């Protein structure tokens, strides 16, 4: 699964997720909800996941992309879900996934863990008015929607790009 996270801040001060809190929440979820066993190696991977996402939050204008390549089954998707559930309200995220079912699952999981509606998925089976997307903290879309919007944007035909890339009045990055 390919995941892209883009984050925008509405304040000039970085508001990242504390790594120790993230690892603790991830370990608790991993063991209690998923009934998996944790290990120091997994916790190290989870720390790196959080640090990578935090780097994007704290360096929003950095042109450098960081790629996460932990092994299969190490919690990349669950880490993304936990991280987004912990995001302060002032930070918006765009997540791009391959399949509509993944988009629905990720948005639903974020909301369930956060205990509030922070995330929505938008795709051909779950259309949400474009103007409502700007107030959505975590937007989950498919690769196809992202590619189509980017293609239309490049040809000045776009109606969705700004809605995908804007959270409140700031740009998602």
Give, region by region, the residue ranges found by the protein language model.
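Conserved coupling segment at the C-terminus of the helicase ATP-binding
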Residues: 18-22, 66-67, 71, 173
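Pre-P-loop entry segment of helicase/translocase ATPase cores
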Residues: 2-57
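Residue-level preference for the first positions of well-ordered beta-strands
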Residues: 63-67, 92-94, 137-140
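Walker A/P-loop
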Residues: 62-80
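Conserved Walker A/P-loop ATP-binding site and its immediately adjacent core
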Residues: 79-112, 145
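SF2 helicase catalytic motif II
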Residues: 145, 155-173
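Well-ordered, non-membrane alpha-helical segments in soluble/globular domains
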Residues: 39-54, 81-82, 151-162
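Inter-Walker segment of RecA-like/P-loop motor cores
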Residues: 113-151
């Amino acid at each position: 699964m390919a995941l892209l996270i883009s984050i925008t801040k509405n304040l000039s001060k970085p508001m990242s997720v504390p790594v120790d809190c993230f690892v603790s929440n991830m370990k608790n979820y991993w063991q209690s909800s998923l009934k998996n066993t944790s290990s120091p190696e997994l916790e190290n991977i989870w720390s790196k996941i959080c640090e990578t996402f935090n780097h994007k939050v704290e360096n929003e204008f950095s042109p450098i992309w960081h790629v996460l390549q932990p092994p299969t089954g190490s919690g990349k998707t669950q880490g993304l879900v936990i991280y987004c559930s912990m995001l302060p309200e002032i930070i918006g995220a765009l997540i791009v996934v391959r399949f509509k079912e993944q988009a629905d699952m990720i948005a639903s999981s974020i909301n369930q863990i956060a205990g509030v509606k922070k995330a929505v998925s938008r795709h051909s089976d779950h259309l949400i008015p474009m103007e409502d997307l700007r107030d959505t903290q975590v937007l989950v879309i498919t690769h196809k929607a992202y590619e189509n919007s980017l293609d239309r944007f490049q040809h000045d035909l776009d109606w969705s790009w700004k809605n995908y890339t804007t959270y409140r009045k700031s740009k998602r990055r």
